[in-house]
Amino acid sequence: MTAVKRILALVDGEHYIPVTREALETVEELDLGELVGAVFIGGTEKISEPEAVKRELGVRVWLSESEDEIPVDMIVKVIEEEDVDVVLDLSDEPVVSPDNRFEIASAVLSAGAEYWCPDLRLKPVEFHDVLEKPSLRIIGTGKRVGKTAVSAYTCRVLNARGYNPCVVVMGRGGPREPEIVRGDEIELTPEYLLKEAEKGKHAASDHWEDALLSRIPTVGCRRCAGGLAGRTFTTNIVRGAKIANELPADFVVVEGSGAAVPPIKTDAGIVIVGANQPLEHIGGYLGPYRIRMCDLAIITMCEEPMADDAKIRKVERTVREAGDGIEVVLSVFRPKPTEDVEGKRAMFVTTAPEEVVSRLVEHLEEEYGCEIVGTSPHLSNRPKLRKDLEKYIDDADILLTELKAAAVDVATREALKAGLGVVYVDNVPIAVGGDYDHVGDAVENVAELAIDRFEG
């Protein structure tokens, strides 16, 4: 038997009270659920005073103490006190703008309820409680914000500091059945990865990157689609998480995909935010929902030309306001080859924007002693990548490439065919501001928080 949904309505003073009352009666006539009452969120054009709504609406009404702001905190309080399942928004402009609606929706979803308005129904991510070990999730507020690089780094830090982690990864190129890659046991050479790609696998998928760069057990999973709130249409990560329970690990990292959120209950969370993202994608839409489910925000790409100081400060302020006490680290990425490349002539391919490639080249040459003879920022664009490879590959001894996108099926294949060595490149997050001097200390603190919650 399906449980009856407990519904809380949002009403305004821009409707005549009889009109709103009839709409509330329709809720029960349509058998949508049990109406627990309504929150008055503002507007005075068609009412004499807010108290009139309370007297005449015919249901329990909560009135805001402020007439100037949408009472988001009150809505959340009523959701929690009345065990509300659905918030039904019966308001309209000018009381609520589209921005207001997403602000309300983020708060409602964070409180565990659904948000409905006449032409949209948003559900929070349904987290499956299947893990039997302490765990943390790593999610992003968008694509290409450095989530997998931070995830691999987090796993390396936790492994080096004795937490014995494994990682469960959800990706758009993941396998039909969850796949275990024992990064702690097998040697993931370019030839090995190319052979896997020739079997039809996406051997540059995030779980292969994590296995190569972190050297820990990895479970690769797939997902399709990502909704506004981060829900997927299909995913096999629940099965993957159950597999993680059986691996020889004491801690589980669960990695999302793009802005999609893995539907696995964890004890703590880290959200990756790109300083180059539009502010409205972070503090607007359902960005705050993602931020609120985490304990630490790592803001990446905190340097020009990705973002100037003013933009970085705005992003940090936006994250802190959305996160309500969330800790923040500002960071930049720097490439680190996984092998010695001193004295080598290298072609460097990356997903980094073209504007920042020269800085990465300078870092590689100064820190690792190689000479970069050509670059391509087109690792995620196969046709352009092939053209760049044709242009520079004859001048190089080795190919330096991130392990993502077309790194294996195009870049590695062409390099090996041309007789070049292939060296994969890690992207290491380096703290440049915020609440911690080192990213590693920040992620370890989240791991400790996860353990405390798991044991508590």
Swiss-Prot record:
Query: What UniProt keywords are attached to this protein's entry?
Result: ATP-binding, Cytoplasm, Ligase, Nucleotide-binding
Q: Which InterPro entries match?
A: Cyc_diphosphoglycerate_synth, P-loop_NTPase
Lineage top rank: taxon: Archaea
Localization recorded for this chain is:
Cytoplasm
* GO BP of this protein: gluconeogenesis
UniProt xrefs under SUPFAM superfamilies: P-loop containing nucleoside triphosphate hydrolases
Swiss-Prot/TrEMBL catalytic activity: (2R)-2,3-bisphosphoglycerate + ATP + H(+) = cyclic (2R)-2,3-bisphosphoglycerate + ADP + phosphate
EC number per UniProt: 6.5.1.9
Q: Does the record's keyword annotation contain tRNA-binding?
A: no
Enzyme class, UniProt record, top EC level: ligase
MF (Gene Ontology): ATP binding; cyclic 2,3-diphosphoglycerate synthetase activity; ligase activity
Q: List, alphabetically, the GO terms of the cellular component aspect.
A: cytoplasm
Q: What does this protein do?
A: Catalyzes the formation of cyclic 2,3-diphosphoglycerate (cDPG) by formation of an intramolecular phosphoanhydride bond at the expense of ATP.
In the record, the note on similarity to other proteins reads: Belongs to the cyclic 2,3-diphosphoglycerate synthetase family.
The name on file for this protein is Cyclic 2,3-diphosphoglycerate synthetase
Annotated organism of origin: Methanopyrus kandleri (strain AV19 / DSM 6324 / JCM 9639 / NBRC 100938)
